[in-house]
């Protein structure tokens, strides 16, 4: 058996480099070096911290290693000597995203992305020490990759998700690195590499995008035949290697434009690295590192790891089984040195695993338990779902019994030949179970530890003939702290000794006494040890007298426990004085350290792993551990399922899949026949929904309820949104207005209307300021001491002012206070002008609103008069006997509801959808709901009801004998004289009344015409006034606009500085971009010029070689032949000159002519040599010309960039001059010479005809004032320079404080990282779920469940409370009745005692004793009855309190306070 330890797996693909024939991979805190088939481990640093990234420079022989601590340190080694040269601390805060050397090894670049993206550059100085030369911040964009250009180290490309940033001038000591940003259009980049033609970027769907560095544009370069993303790129010579997300590796020949598929790996390609052999390439995928031969497309595994983190390590027979988080299994056989990876495609995550007999049992977070055999092939023997809750831990007796637990339930499962069968379960736990361990006393007992520190001893009773298996709780103990892991050491009938890794980071030994009375006081440990700095994670038994433990510090400790394997006397907690037997530092600190450990063999060997894919295999537990091994042979193994053991033999799963399928098919056939028969019988009456299954019907009902609930919820939120919008409008646009919006509409034309002006509510503070400004301005005008430019300007006419203000309204009190436009050139004056203009605008608006209100009141009065006239017309028409009025009689003015300002928040029936209005008219109870508009119309109609108007008509009663409708009717020929006389009088009276009625009707019709005319006249008058008011409003609006423009002009003085500053900053920003572009072009120009000069030198060398070759040919055959040499030389010279002119061809050996054949062949060889040399020169000349064209192209771009930069510099200078002219208020100063006579108004007058004479003394005074102003300017300029210097000092102080802030933020992030790390460790140790979304879903489900349960409990509590109240009332009545009986009995006893004493019969001792005994018996019975009733009351009260506490926990607090 090999005694050397070995390591499986590696940290990440970023911790991979190829150094000559060696492959270096970071594994934990060390580096695995593979050379050919042998591997070894090298600990470059302390080994306590993980290796992050590796970078190697073959030219300089430097190896850079990052060590991830609380911050990141960079170590520099000389390799392969492994000599430590340098350590640079704090190169990154969390981790290094990418680290890369330039092609010449002179520059190292580090990319960090947390807290912000930063690229740091180090140059290799003398002595091969790295010196930081530059650092560039890229902001908050997450970058992925770095790449240097070929044969250059002064620039680098940084890959972003949607673009590329190019940093230039990294090696310049004068300039800081300049950044050029190039964004893509519709591409998401995953990888990049700098090649010969430019920057290649890998995008989605197999696309490779080429970035042209000169033109700064992108174009599609290659389209690979794959739908996956391009995740890795590498150029090696003329081949471009392309790695994809699906594991395909393509090659693309840049010269031939040919693409081919090299190999399919099946795993996502992460990195591609070059090797010393140009025919090989190193491919790093997510799970392995492979060397691929380009010619043969054969692959050789360099190193491999599992696809996910390690959860459990098992030793089954001679195999080491690695159980991964995703369910995959990795087996390692030491005898054959082979490792097999078996992917298990289950959607669950693995929680724990253990060995039962010859099978491995794995538990999942979905509640499933599966058993596997791993001897020859990995196969699933059995599976079953134990619980709906996620499982947390498992343990076994190693033979046939398995115990698993979810949150609060422990399940016992019997295992027979790998078949799983549920035996029993126990749910007596109040808290979550975290750890399970099998007892050591040989019985079927399990110790279960909870997260509150309790340890329960569960005994599995087994099956019998009459009953099923059961679980009993023998004993419960409470420890002082919860445990991370524990291990039973010794057990008998009295005590159980356990070894514990506690959460307080101590290792302890407890004695669990079986006879101990249950107390609330926790147990105290017997011995305390501090084996692990960060606390222990796992414990295992190592032989009979020792244990092996591992912790978060990455150490494995072996300790002797022989003195714990007995019953110990009770002792106070003491510190263990014995030191561990062995200590091994195997894994780095962080990420939980060692989380899984298993004993390998009887020689003290063990295997351990953590929350990654690195596994240490130590065959012999001796110190020190020597790591040297041959890499195992990896093979992929497929999982198989045993047909007879694919399911568990429980109640519903005992039938095989084939039998179930046959039964279902037969049942479906019978059901199909019954359905066809039923359809034939009841086709007309059967509905389609009758065939729905109950589950489908229930699902449909649930969907309907969900849609109804969603609709109601949407309606509710829309109503809430509408209310919020109305509230916002009312509070921010209505309540703040002193005068709300309103309008007046013409009586005849609805399009003619006039609006008022909105006015906000006055502010008291603003009114005070306005009052003070007016007073100050009035005092300023009165004193006339202020200088004004307007006084220097001559006006054509003093009274030629804008007269629109006079026609718009009365003059304002601020008209005389306003500044002239020319005088508003300082900040204070602009402020005063703004306030005065605001007062002026407010005055104009108020003046117009007064006229508006006057017209509105008048219109209201006229509308009332028109309504009265219309009413009079209606009554007149009724008197005239017409029931309906003609349209031309009644005047109907135009009505607009918006004339009332309050209607803005009212909704009328005309604004509602008629369909919705029909639904809203009737309420649910069938009563008619009258809308407000209908109610107002009804009120108006009722108010208009009056007495019936008498109609004007002839009202003369006809005599009865003349009415043919009566019985007294007498025909005219039969009437008497008297009747004839009466009828004549009747006719006469009818004629008179007819004339009178006609006259009244004519008068009424004239009155109607007058009323109609009056209505039209008043309406026309109102309309004319509205037109006039509209004109006035237009003038006022124009005046307000003009005043607001003056406000804008005054406000521009305040905004001028900011505007000029923004303009200046924009120009500077564009200038910086152009400068970065120019520096990048300079770098590109130098690189291409260097290539051109090298190519030109190669051309000259080839020309010299050709000349030397021709010269040397003269001394070689055939030109040395004495007969033909001179002739052939002349012929060769002639041929060469003609061939250069294109007039001759290469001679053929078969056409020798008279020349001897051997000499002619030699002559032809010389010609071919010349042709080959000439072709080589032409080819090199073409390359040189192409490079020259590229240089010229770069020069052209540089000129364009330089011209643009010059333009930006001119724009910058213009901005500076604009600042001097506009911001500093500079005016031209005119110096008057001594004795000069000049008019100071001449420069602003139309001509020089008007001037004034000045004395010489006045001129002298003016000059003195000018010189004094120069002195003042000098003082101001010095003061401004001092202020500028102080501003620079403040800027420097600000930068220093910002640096201090950055330092403090960095320390805060480090502390936060430490806290998050510790929280992650606690989370991993406690087994809590780390998915926030899952926790939120669980909490939501928990809330809903608690809500439903609590509602049921509330209802139950109310029923119980009412029942208890009734019982209490009954008990009270019963107690009152019993008290009355007791009182009556007491009185009777007292009376009998008195009578007895009077009679003297109590002297009989026998009777007295008998009565005394009976009295004592009665008293005891009554006392017992009272005690029972009191206990009953107390029990009922406690029941009420318990129900309250269970239903609402806050009631429990109130109950306690009340009890106190």
Curated annotation (Swiss-Prot):
Keywords: Cell projection, Cilium, Coiled coil, Cytoplasm, Cytoskeleton, Flagellum, Repeat, WD repeat. Gene3D superfamilies: YVTN repeat-like/Quinoprotein amine dehydrogenase (2.130.10.10). InterPro entries: Beta-prop_CFAP43_2nd, CFAP43_N, WD40/YVTN_repeat-like_dom_sf, WD40_repeat_dom_sf. Its main location: other. It is found in: Cell projection, Cilium, Flagellum; Cytoplasm, Cytoskeleton, Flagellum axoneme. WD repeats lie at residues 46-87, 91-132, 184-221, 303-342, 428-468, 529-569, 589-628, 911-951, 1129-1170. It comes from the Eukaryota. One of its GO terms (cellular component) is motile cilium. Transmembrane segments: none annotated. GO terms for biological process: axoneme assembly; cilium assembly; cilium-dependent cell motility; spermatogenesis. Residues 1170-1214, 1399-1446 form a coiled coil. Flagellar protein involved in flagellum axoneme organization and function. Belongs to the CFAP43 family. PANTHER family: CILIA- AND FLAGELLA-ASSOCIATED PROTEIN 43, CILIA- AND FLAGELLA-ASSOCIATED PROTEIN 43-RELATED. This is Cilia- and flagella-associated protein 43.
């Amino acid at each position: 058996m090999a005694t050397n330890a070995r390591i499986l797996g590696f940290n990440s693909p970023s911790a991979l480099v190829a150094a000559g024939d060696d492959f270096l991979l970071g594994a934990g805190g060390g580096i695995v070096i593979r050379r050919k088939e042998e591997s070894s481990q090298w600990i470059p640093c302390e080994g306590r911290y993980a290796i992050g990234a590796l970078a190697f420079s073959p030219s300089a022989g430097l190896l850079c290693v990052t060590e991830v601590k609380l911050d990141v340190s960079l170590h520099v080694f000389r390799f392969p000597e492994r000599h430590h040269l340098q350590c640079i601390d704090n190169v990154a805060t969390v981790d290094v995203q990418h680290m890369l050397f330039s092609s010449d090894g002179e520059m190292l670049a580090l990319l960090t992305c947390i807290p912000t993206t930063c690229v740091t550059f180090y140059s290799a100085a003398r002595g091969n020490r790295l010196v930081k030369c530059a650092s560039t911040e890229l902001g908050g964009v997450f970058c992925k990759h770095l790449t240097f250009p070929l044969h250059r180290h002064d620039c680098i490309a940084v890959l972003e998700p949607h673009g590329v940033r190019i940093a230039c001038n990294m090696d310049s000591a004068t300039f800081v690195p300049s950044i050029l940003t190039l964004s893509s259009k519709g591409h998401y980049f995953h990888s990049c590499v700098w090649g010969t033609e430019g920057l290649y970027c890998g995008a989605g769907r197999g696309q490779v995008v080429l970035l042209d560095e000169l033109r700064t544009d992108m174009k599609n370069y290659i389209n690979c035949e794959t739908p996956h993303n391009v995740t890795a790129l590498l150029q090696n010579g003329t081949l471009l290697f392309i790695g994809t997300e699906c594991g395909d590796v393509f090659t693309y020949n840049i010269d031939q434009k040919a693409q081919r598929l090299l190999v399919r790996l099946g795993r996502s390609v992460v990195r591609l690295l070059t090797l010393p052999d140009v025919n090989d390439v190193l491919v790093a995928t997510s799970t392995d590192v492979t060397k691929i031969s380009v010619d043969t497309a054969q692959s050789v595994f360099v190193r491999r790891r599992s696809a996910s983190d390690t959860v459990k390590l098992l030793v089954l027979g001679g195999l080491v089984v690695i159980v991964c988080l995703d369910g995959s299994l990795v087996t390692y056989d030491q005898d054959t040195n082979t490792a097999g990876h078996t992917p298990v495609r289950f959607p669950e995550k693995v929680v724990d695993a253990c060995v039962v007999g010859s099978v491995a049992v794995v538990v999942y977070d979905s509640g499933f338990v599966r058993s596997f055999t791993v001897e020859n092939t990995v196969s699933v023997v059995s599976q079953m779902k134990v619980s709906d809750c996620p499982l947390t831990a498992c343990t076994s007796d190693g033979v046939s019994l398995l115990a698993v637990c979810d949150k609060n339930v422990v399940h016992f499962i019997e295992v027979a030949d790998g078949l799983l069968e549920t035996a029993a379960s126990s749910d007596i736990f109040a808290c979550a179970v975290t750890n399970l361990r099998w007892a050591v006393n040989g019985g079927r007992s399990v110790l279960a530890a909870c997260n509150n520190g309790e340890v329960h001893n569960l005994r599995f009773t087994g099956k019998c003939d009459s009953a099923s298996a059961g679980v009993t709780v023998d004993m419960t103990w409470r420890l002082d702290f919860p445990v991370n892991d524990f291990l039973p050491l010794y057990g008998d009938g009295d005590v159980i000794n356990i070894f514990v890794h506690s959460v307080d980071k101590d290792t302890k030994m407890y004695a669990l006494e079986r006879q101990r009375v249950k107390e609330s006081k926790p147990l105290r440990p017997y011995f305390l040890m501090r084996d692990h700095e960060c606390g222990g994670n796992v414990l295992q038994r190592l032989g009979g007298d020792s244990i092996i433990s591992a912790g978060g510090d990455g150490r494995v400790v072996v300790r002797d426990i022989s003195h714990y394997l007995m019953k110990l006397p009770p002792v106070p907690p003491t510190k263990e004085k014995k030191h561990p037997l062995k200590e091994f530092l195997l894994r780095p600190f962080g990420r939980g350290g060692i989380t899984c450990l298993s004993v390998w063999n009887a020689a003290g060997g063990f295997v351990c792993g953590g929350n990654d894919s690195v596994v240490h295999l130590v065959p012999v537990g001796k110190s020190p551990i020597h790591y040297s091994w041959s890499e195992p042979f990896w093979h992929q193994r497929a999982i198989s399922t045993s047909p007879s053991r694919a399911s568990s033999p429980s109640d519903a799963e005992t039938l095989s899949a084939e039998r179930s399928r046959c039964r279902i098919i037969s049942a479906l056939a019978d059901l199909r026949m019954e359905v066809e028969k039923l359809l034939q019988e009841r086709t007309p009456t059967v509905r389609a929904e009758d065939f729905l299954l109950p589950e489908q019907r229930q699902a449909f009902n649930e969907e309907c309820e969900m849609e109804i609930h969603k609709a109601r919820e949407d309606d509710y939120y829309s109503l809430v949104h509408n209310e919020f919008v109305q509230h916002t409008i009312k509070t921010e646009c209505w309540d703040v207005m002193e005068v709300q919006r309103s309008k007046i509409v013409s009586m005849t034309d609805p399009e003619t209307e006039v609006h008022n002006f909105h006015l906000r509510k006055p502010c008291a503070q603003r009114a005070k300021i306005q009052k003070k400004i007016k007073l100050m301005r009035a005092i300023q005008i009165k004193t006339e001491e202020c200088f004004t430019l307007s006084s220097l300007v001559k006006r054509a006419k003093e009274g030629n002012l804008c007269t629109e203000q006079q026609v718009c309204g009365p003059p304002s009190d601020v008209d005389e206070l306003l500044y002239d436009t020319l005088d508003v050139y300082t900040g204070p004056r602009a402020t005063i002008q703004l306030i005065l203009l605001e007062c002026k605008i407010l005055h104009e608006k108020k003046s117009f609103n007064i006229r508006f209100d006057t017209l509105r009141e008048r219109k209201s009065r006229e509308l009332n008069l028109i309504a009265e006239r219309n009413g009079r017309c209606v009554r007149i028409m009724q008197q005239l006997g017409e029931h309906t009025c003609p349209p031309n009689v009644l005047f109907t003015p135009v009505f607009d509801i918006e004339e009332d300002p309050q209607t803005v928040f009212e909704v009328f029936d005309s604004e509602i959808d008629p369909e919705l209005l029909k639904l809203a008219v009737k309420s649910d109870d069938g009563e008619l709901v009258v809308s407000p508009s209908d109610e107002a119309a009804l009120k108006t109609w009722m108010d208009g009801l009056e007495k019936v108007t008498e109609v004007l008509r002839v009202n003369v009663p006809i005599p009865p004998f003349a009415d043919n409708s009566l019985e007294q009717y007498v025909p005219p020929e039969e009437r008497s004289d008297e009747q004839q006389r009466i009828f004549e009088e009747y006719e006469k009276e009818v004629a008179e009344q007819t004339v009178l009625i006609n006259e009244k009707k004519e008068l009424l019709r004239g009155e109607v015409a007058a009323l109609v005319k009056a209505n039209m006249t008043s309406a026309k008058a109102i309309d004319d006034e509205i037109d006039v008011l509209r004109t006035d409003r237009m003038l006022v609006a124009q005046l307000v606009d003009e005043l607001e423009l003056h406000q804008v002009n005054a406000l521009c003085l305040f905004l001028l500085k900011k505007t000029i500053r923004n303009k200046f900053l924009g120009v500077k920003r564009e200038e910086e971009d152009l400068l970065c572009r120019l520096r990048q072009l300079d770098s590109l120009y130098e690189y291409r010029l260097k290539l051109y000069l090298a190519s030109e030198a190669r051309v000259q060398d080839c020309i010299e070689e050709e000349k030397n070759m021709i010269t040397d040919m003269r001394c070689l055959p055939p030109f040395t032949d004495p007969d033909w040499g001179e002739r052939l030389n002349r012929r060769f010279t002639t041929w060469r000159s003609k061939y250069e002119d294109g007039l001759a061809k290469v001679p053929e050996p078969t056409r020798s002519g008279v020349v001897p054949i051997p000499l002619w062949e030699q002559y032809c060889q010389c010609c071919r040599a010349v042709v080959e040399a000439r072709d080589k020169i032409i080819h090199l000349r073409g390359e040189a010309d192409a490079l020259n064209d590229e240089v010229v192209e770069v020069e052209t771009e540089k000129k364009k960039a330089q011209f643009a930069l010059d333009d930006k510099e001119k724009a910058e200078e213009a901005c500076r001059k604009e600042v001097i002219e506009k911001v500093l208020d500079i005016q031209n100063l005119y110096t008057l010479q001594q004795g000069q006579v000049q008019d100071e108004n001449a420069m602003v007058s139309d001509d020089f005809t008007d001037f004034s004479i000045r004395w010489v003394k006045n001129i002298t005074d003016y000059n003195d004032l000018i010189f004094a102003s120069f002195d003042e300017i000098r003082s101001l300029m010095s003061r401004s320079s001092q202020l500028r210097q102080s501003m620079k000092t403040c800027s420097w102080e600000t930068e220093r404080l910002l640096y201090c802030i950055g330092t403090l933020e960095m320390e805060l992030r480090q502390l936060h990282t430490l806290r998050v790390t510790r929280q992650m460790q606690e989370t991993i140790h406690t087994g809590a779920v780390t998915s926030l979304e899952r926790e939120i879903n669980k909490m939501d489900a928990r809330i809903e469940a608690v809500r439903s349960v609590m509602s049921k409990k509330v209802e139950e509590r109310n029923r119980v409370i009412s029942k208890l109240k009734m019982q209490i009332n009954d008990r009270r009545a019963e107690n009152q009745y019993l008290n009355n009986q007791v009182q009556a009995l007491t009185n009777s006893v007292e009376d009998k005692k008195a009578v007895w004493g009077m009679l003297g019969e109590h002297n009989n001792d026998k009777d007295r004793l008998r009565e005394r005994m009976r009295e004592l018996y009665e008293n005891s019975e009554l006392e017992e009855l009272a005690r029972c009733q009191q206990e009953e009351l107390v029990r009922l009260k406690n029941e009420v309190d318990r129900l309250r506490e269970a239903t609402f926990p806050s009631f429990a607090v109130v109950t306690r306070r009340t009890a106190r």
